[in-house]
């Protein structure tokens, strides 16, 4: 049986805090003994990143990983098995250097955790960067993986987020700058020659937030193109890729934070409005295979011939080709908003419980937020759990607002094509 998000949070708190208290002195003792004989790495050579639960973060951390790579570090990554595919979009980390943990059951979680701790020591990881925001589980993994240089976010004088004292380089988490800059701050701490309290006493310019583009396989691109044209033909829709526009609508968001969802009815109304403005263009409503019924409801309410249910029609590896063929995508604040950033696709991303100032896409994206006084209501301080059961922040975003931004993005796409 799969472990629910709330169960994970409860385990992290009620089990994680006592374990951090017990393990921290042991790790400190081991450090003290090792320091008698060796001084540890002069600079990171084998650098492990830990980010378990967020697929989008695998994209947002890529500039930081490439920064470390440019400094000569060999990269490793630990992630939940269900999220592993996100690391294949840019392939910054070698496949054989990716470790996974099965989060679908308690037994699988324990088994893979123990296996990882053995593997990390076998690979002689010398530096670990904990990317998670105050997770006790990842703090324990960081402390026990055998790395001498351990970097992560520390609460210092804050309250409620204590997770022991296993970090050797403690970084101040800044909730007022984009998460990618926070990740780059961790890289500075990992490679710094002198200890700072707190890390990182540097300025991170916007120019550092650079995202590489995915390498698109021409064969896969043609396969996706043919599949779309075949589906359109079967639905009696006149569509030729490159002639008519291809517009993507991604109406769902993960169960991790359902408050991020814009209403199904709004997406249906948006599809109707887009079709009225661009009657000859094809609209694909995307989603995973498990989201087929959710997507179908959006499609059936919209009742537009040129709008097709495309849920489950492409694999994860085929997303970059799909995005490359498309002109614009509208999505809730979820993985696709970040996955598409590795392609030239223009997006419109709807934010409510989160803020684009911290988690905005670093691609060709326009964010929309209602800027309510209560928003953002999820943060590192509450482990992204909100009491809200009425997402007015999303309800306040109108179809007209979104359509205006779609028009802007399509105009920009047309200019790029030379239309």
Residue ranges, per PLM feature:
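Catalytic machinery of carbohydrate-active enzymes
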Residues: 1-419
């Amino acid at each position: 049986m799969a472990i629910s998000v709330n169960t994970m949070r409860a385990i992290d708190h009620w089990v994680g805090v006592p374990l951090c208290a017990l393990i921290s002195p042991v790790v400190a003792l081991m450090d003290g003994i090792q320091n008698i004989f060796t001084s540890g790495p002069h600079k990171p050579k084998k650098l492990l990143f830990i980010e378990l639960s967020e697929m989008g973060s695998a994209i947002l951390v890529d500039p930081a990983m490439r920064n470390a790579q440019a400094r000569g570090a060999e990269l490793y990554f630990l992630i939940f098995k269900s999220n592993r595919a996100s690391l294949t979009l840019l392939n910054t980390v070698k496949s054989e250097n990716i470790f996974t943990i099965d989060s679908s059951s308690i037994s699988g979680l324990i088994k893979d955790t123990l296996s990882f701790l053995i593997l990390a020591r076998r690979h002689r990881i010398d530096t670990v960067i904990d990317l998670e925001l105050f997770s006790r589980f990842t703090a324990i993994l960081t402390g026990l993986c055998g790395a001498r240089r351990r970097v992560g976010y520390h609460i210092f004088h804050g309250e409620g987020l204590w997770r022991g004292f296993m970090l050797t380089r403690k970084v101040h988490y800044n909730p007022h700058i984009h998460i990618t800059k926070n990740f780059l701050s961790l890289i500075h701490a990992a490679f710094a020659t002198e200890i700072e309290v707190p890390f990182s006493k540097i300025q991170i310019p916007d120019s550092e937030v650079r995202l590489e583009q995915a390498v698109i396989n021409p064969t896969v691109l043609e396969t996706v193109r043919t599949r779309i044209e075949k589906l359109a033909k079967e639905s009696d829709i006149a569509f030729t890729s490159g002639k008519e526009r291809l517009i993507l609508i991604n109406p769902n968001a993960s169960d991790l934070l359902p408050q991020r969802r814009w209403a199904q009815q709004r997406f249906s109304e948006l599809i109707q409005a887009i079709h009225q403005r661009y009657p000859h263009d094809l609209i694909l409503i995307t989603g995973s295979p498990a989201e087929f019924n959710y997507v179908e409801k959006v499609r059936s309410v919209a009742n537009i011939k040129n709008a097709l249910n495309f849920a489950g029609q492409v694999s994860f590896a085929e997303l970059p080709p799909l995005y490359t063929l498309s002109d614009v995508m509208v999505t809730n604040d979820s993985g696709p908003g970040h996955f598409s950033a590795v392609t030239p696709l223009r997006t419109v991303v709807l934010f409510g419980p989160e803020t684009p100032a911290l988690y905005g896409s670093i691609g060709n994206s326009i964010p929309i937020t209602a800027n309510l006084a209560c928003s953002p209501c999820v943060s590192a301080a509450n482990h992204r759990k909100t009491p809200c059961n009425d997402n007015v922040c999303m309800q306040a975003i109108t179809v007209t607002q979104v359509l205006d931004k779609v028009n802007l993005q399509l105009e920009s796409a047309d200019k790029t094509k030379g239309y």
